[in-house]
């Protein structure tokens, strides 16, 4: 087992790029968890991550906080859980699973610009500032 173990959770275009980079880095990506197409029906930029997961284990979920999903993630004994492109708020059982913590990101300034397609909304709303949280 590698010295550093990670799990990735997400399912948007940005998630695919990050999973590809993690696979290429050979830095201990144990598993990729992606929302099922049904669970991600509100994401127009949904990407099924299986083609990007390489040799990492791949799982699809309906609810990232469901006890069964959290148990599957815990089986990989992750040091870090990366979270990009998830529309659910992670609850305490999942947050407590990795030994180091969860690292997430959103391509907008939160909480004001939460939700899908924040770059498009920033342009549409004429925002003069945009960022990453």
Question: What are the residue ranges of the model-derived segments?
Answer:
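One-carbon transfer enzymes
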Residues: 1-133
